[in-house]
A protein has these predicted regions:
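Catalytic cores of nucleotide-sugar-dependent glycosyltransferases that transfer UDP/GDP/TDP-activated
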Residues: 1-469
Length: 469
C-alpha cells in the first residue's frame, strides 16, 4: 500500500504557486520549504497522496485564493484549508488561542476520511496540533521546528531586548512550551544540519538526540541555475534604475523578510562605514513586497524605520536599492544578475537554522558572505563558496564584505564551487530519498505502531523512488 502524508503548516500565506515570500514575518523560507517538500514527496513511487493543511483566511487584505477550502497543487498534492479564529489574517503569535478548536476540526475531518500514515508538523504551532492529532489517530508524528523559541530568545536578549519585551512581541513562553511537548511526543525530528540537533535542539529537556535525523533541504535546479539571459538582466536593471547612480557596480545582494532576526540595519551600518564598499559596490535590499510602510505590522515598521534612518545617516542615496515589489520569478534572476556583475549574496541574520537562500544564490553562481550562526557553517563546509562572519561585530562584517569583492580570482573559485557543491549535495530528489529511507529504517522493524500498511509500505524501501515521467 502506498503512503499518505499529512503536513501541517498553520501560519503565513501558502498556496500552490506565486508564493508571497517576504510579504511579512510569517511568509518566508519555511513556506517555500514545505511546498517543495510536499511536491517532491508526491513525485515518488512510494507516496499516493500528500495533504498540506493550513489556515483558511477570508480577508480582503489578502488574495481570495487563501479562502479556498481545497486547492489542487499537482497530481497527488492538495492544500486543505480549515477555518480557525477570526476571518482576518493574523500573525502566528496571535493564533495560539484557536489551535484547540482547529485540532477538533481536524479530528472530525478524519473521522469521515482516510487517515494519513504519517503526520509531519512544521513549527511550534503545528507541533502543538500534531501531538494531539497523532495520539488520536495513532499514527507517527514527524516534527521540523524550522526555528526554535529558545534560540530566538537567546539571540534577542543579545540584542538588548528584555524577557518581558520578548514575551510581549512573540508569545515566546507558549512557543517554547509547545516545542517541549512536541519534542517529547515526536517520533522523528527532522533537522537540516548537525548544528541544529547538537546545539539548538539540545537546549530542550524533552529532546532525545536519537530522534534527530539530519536531512538537508534541496534547491529547485530548474529555477536556480547560472545561465542568465539578456532579457532578465535588462528587467533587473530597470528595477534598480530609480535607486542607483551606477547599476554596473558589483552588488551586495540580500533577500529576506523585514524582521529583526534578519539584522538588515547592521548590514547597512557596515556598508556605510566602509569607504571602499561605498565607492566600489551597490547595496541591494530585497525585503518582500509592500504598498506602504504605514500598512506593515509593528515589527516590520520598526525594521524599515531603522533601515531608512541608517541610509540617511550615511547619505547612501544612489548606492542602496530597496524596491517595493518584485515577482517570485525575479528572485532567481536577481541572483544571476548579481553574479554577472561580480557581486556577492549577504545573509546577515542573527540566527539561521539552515539558509535556503544561500543555496539558491550559490546554485546561480553567486558567492556568499553569511552569518556564522547555524546552518551556513555546514553549507560552506560542503561547498566552499564564500566567507562566514560574526554579524554582531559591525567592524568585522565590514572587513569581510570588503574581502568578498577584493579578489576576482577568488570570486571565480567561490562561484564555481557553489554551483558544483549545491548540485552535488542539495537537491529535493536527494532529500525525499533520505526522508523515506529514514521512515523505512525507523518503522519497518518497530512495534510502536500496529498499522500494517505503514510497515509494508516502508519495507518496500526506496529503490525505485522517483515516478517515471
Amino acid at each position: 500500500m502506498r503512503l499518505k502524508f499529512l503536513h501541517l503548516h498553520l501560519h503565513g500565506l501558502i498556496r500552490s504557486k506565486n508564493l508571497e515570500l517576504g510579504r511579512d514575518a510569517d511568509t518566508g523560507g519555511q513556506t517555500q520549504y514545505v511546498l517543495e517538500l510536499v511536491k517532491s514527496l508526491a513525485n515518488t513511487s512510494e507516496v499516493d497522496q500528500v495533504d498540506l493543511v493550513t489556515r483558511l483566511i477570508n480577508d480582503p487584505k489578502v488574495d481570495k485564493e487563501y479562502s479556498q477550502k481545497e486547492e489542487f497543487v499537482e497530481p497527488g498534492v492538495r492544500i486543505l484549508r480549515f477555518k480557525f479564529g477570526p476571518n482576518q489574517y493574523l500573525r502566528k503569535e496571535l493564533l495560539w488561542p484557536y489551535l484547540d478548536h482547529f485540532t477538533e476540526s481536524l479530528i472530525s475531518y478524519y473521522k469521515k476520511n482516510k487517515k494519513p500514515n504519517f503526520i509531519h508538523a512544521h513549527y511550534a504551532d503545528a507541533g502543538y496540533v500534531g501531538v494531539k492529532l497523532s495520539k488520536y489517530l495513532k499514527v507517527p508524528l514527524i516534527f521540523t521546528g524550522h526555528s526554535l523559541g529558545r534560540e530566538k530568545k537567546r539571540k534577542l536578549i543579545d540584542t538588548g531586548l528584555t524577557t518581558n519585551q520578548i514575551e510581549k512581541l512573540y508569545s515566546i513562553r507558549k512557543r517554547i512550551e509547545a516545542e517541549e511537548k512536541t519534542l517529547k511526543s515526536a517520533d522523528i525530528v527532522v533537522t537540516s544540519t548537525n548544528q541544529e540537533s547538537v546545539i539548538q535542539y539540545s537546549q530542550y529537556s524533552s529532546f532525545s538526540p536519537h530522534k534527530a535525523k539530519v536531512i538537508p533541504p534541496g534547491v529547485d535546479h530548474k529555477k536556480f541555475h547560472h545561465f542568465h539571459s539578456t532579457t532578465e538582466t535588462a528587467e533587473i536593471d530597470n528595477m534598480m534604475k530609480p535607486f542607483l547612480k551606477d547599476s554596473t557596480k558589483p552588488p551586495l545582494l540580500t533577500i529576506s523578510r523585514a524582521v529583526r532576526r534578519k539584522n538588515i540595519p547592521s548590514l547597512i551600518e557596515a556598508y556605510g562605514r566602509s569607504e571602499k564598499l561605498k565607492r566600489k559596490t551597490n547595496l541591494i535590499l530585497i525585503l518582500g513586497c509592500r504598498e506602504s510602510t504605514s500598512k506593515l505590522d509593528p515589527q516590520q515598521k520598526d525594521v524599515f524605520h531603522n533601515i531608512f534612518e541608517t541610509i540617511d545617516k550615511y547619505n547612501l542615496y544612489g548606492k542602496v536599492a530597496y524596491p517595493k515589489k518584485h515577482l517570485p520569478s525575479q528572485i532567481p534572476a536577481l541572483y544571476r544578475w548579481a553574479a554577472s556583475r561580480g557581486g556577492v549574496f549577504v545573509n546577515p541574520a542573527l540566527t539561521e537554522p539552515f539558509g535556503l537562500t544561500l543555496l539558491e544564490a550559490s546554485s546561480c553562481g553567486l558567492p556568499i558572505i553569511s552569518t556564522n550562526d547555524g546552518g551556513p557553517k555546514e553549507i560552506r563546509s560542503k561547498c566552499e563558496n564564500g566567507l562566514l562572519v560574526d554579524v554582531t561585530n559591525i567592524d568585522e562584517l565590514k572587513v569581510i564584505l570588503e574581502k568578498g569583492i577584493s579578489n576576482n580570482n577568488q570570486w571565480k573559485i567561490w562561484s564555481r564551487n557553489g554551483i558544483e557543491g549545491v548540485n552535488r549535495h542539495f537537491s529535493w530528489n536527494t532529500h525525499v530519498r533520505n526522508y523515506l529511507s529514514v521512515l523505512s529504517e525507523e518503522f519497518s522493524s518497530s512495534n510502536s505502531y500496529s498499522s500494517s500498511d505503514i510497515k509494508q509500505s516502508c519495507l518496500k524501501g526506496t529503490s525505485s523512488l522517483i515516478k517515471p515521467h
